[in-house]
């Protein structure tokens, strides 16, 4: 039976977002939500017919909130809003981000506080399920009042306007609708505002980054465990009784992950057998990786709330009361997404330092730059440079966006979140750090193959090594390879969910204890 996810505004999970955004799983509006949506819409219709003054329904927007709009102009008001607010810049957001945006907006609207018609929500749902993906530029949102510019781009194809992607083609909005067999709509009172006023874009991008960060945290433990085996690392820093007396959850989880990955390894040692202590990048993995785990677990808890929240304005209450408030403001997610970027950046930083230890012959006791006949061959020399470049770029990107604000809309919107910038930066940091971790895994596998002794790997690291070696070969001589091809293969391997799934079938990995 084909899987379909019900949207009720209450129970959407991060895993559901991934399934719909990346795996194309279909979704539908849960029957339980229909009554609330219809009741909310009736209140808006009554507001228009009674000529009541309500922001965004019978008034202008932003600093024009005191301009009254006649009932006969309320429909034109909404279309004008979409046409003028679609003013983004930059490259288009990727397909998975666009699908996540559409999904999260639908899930917010079905809670029944936005006064939008059920048929309008169903139209956005139809685009999502049929794979019509609006062209949404990545830049142009202040994260308050919501993600106005990018969400307006999302709405344009619903009206037969704008641009959209359909089955690999970049088309006009109307062409995309025609090819998908979808009729365009006209917006009714308040509907344009209901569709674009909210934190949906920053939440969608941040949600995808959060999910990927959770996977990266596990991969970083794997990379660190492989590096530890290269160096015949001391295992006592991962003993549980060390961490129970400082019971930070991420620290405990990291230590357990490392123990599980290294179970049965013959490439480790005990303190005083050959040395007393390992360097921080190996010995302190529970404390370093664990801190990022705790940070990202916190961010996930915020994402779980936001993807099931109403971030519209004004809010149409069940009793007919209308509240003009600030739920569109992105600050509650801007700060966590800045935090997310910092946490991921640290994973890239420490991984790059372990790459340096692997390629440095004085530290690894292996051939310089992990290649036979160094001098004639340069091996992983510039690979470490590239990782250092990414790590340093991350340090710049990790500067928080949420500490900045520029007043807008004639100073009516005088303090904004920059949350969408925070989310986009976090995703860029994620991509950089994932490249570094992939390189560490590649370098560690190369180093293990160069070790004079060939001892059994750990229960988890052996699975990872074997899978990795099916796609990325040992580098014998420079003349046989173009190393960027191998680096790209390494990234492709670890980004494939099946790689981590196979390791987790062998050993348990988690981010919280």
Swiss-Prot record:
Enzyme class of the recorded protein, top EC level: lyase
Query: Which of the residues bear the PTM 2,3-didehydroalanine (Ser)?
Result: 145
Q: What is its main location?
A: cytoplasm
The compartments listed are: Cytoplasm
Pathway(s) per entry: Amino-acid degradation; L-histidine degradation into L-glutamate; N-formimidoyl-L-glutamate from L-histidine: step 1/3
Q: Which domain of life is it from?
A: Bacteria
Q: Does the keyword Acyltransferase apply?
A: no
The question of whether Membrane is a record keyword is answered with: no
Under the heading InterPro entries, the entry gives: Aromatic_Lyase (IPR001106), Fumarase/histidase_N (IPR024083), HutH (IPR005921), L-Aspartase-like (IPR008948), Phe/His_NH3-lyase_AS (IPR022313)
**Catalytic activity field:** L-histidine = trans-urocanate + NH4(+)
Family to which this protein belongs: Belongs to the PAL/histidase family.
Tell me which PANTHER family the record gives: HISTIDINE AMMONIA-LYASE
Protein name as annotated: Histidine ammonia-lyase
Gene name of the encoded protein = hutH
